[in-house]
Amino acid sequence: MMRPGLARLLLLCCLLLPAAAQAQAQPQAADEYAAKAAFIYNIAQFSTLPNMNGVVRLCVLGRDPFGSALATLEGKPLGNARLSIVYPHSGPEALMQCHILYISASESDDMTALADSARAAGVLTIADTRGAARKGVMLELVLDDRRIAFEFNGAAARGAGVVLSSKVLRLARAIY
């Protein structure tokens, strides 16, 4: 005869085993973009952005690679403001509602034009497409030995009036 405590423990293990196996089977990309979402939020905490008025709008332009990772950030505080996630239609006029713009890889053909339009509007731009910082995007997220790193385009940030903390800039893998 099995003791009740041991029986409950065995039942709990049987119930959790499939969930643990499923978590192991999830694509690595989901973990990567969850980490990138957290990274973007942390960068935003150490950024001074023009035109903030109680809400900081993080826009995702193009195909959304984040899945549900960004939804967990909705409403989180950024100084005296709250973070709002927006999915604008394409085009430079859509950028006017953004404070931070993530440019998806699906928009890589238009990356330079989008970065230029966003800079003119005072919007912090972020992408994880290779070479994005050299095309005018302010922060290029890079996967470096399974860690998120970034390259920073200082000229683009200055042109937009975006200021990143020197503490953040010390972590940059490269500064242009």
Can you name each region flagged by the protein language model?
Residues 2-8, 12, 21-176:
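Short hydrophobic alpha-helices and adjacent helix-cap/hinge residues
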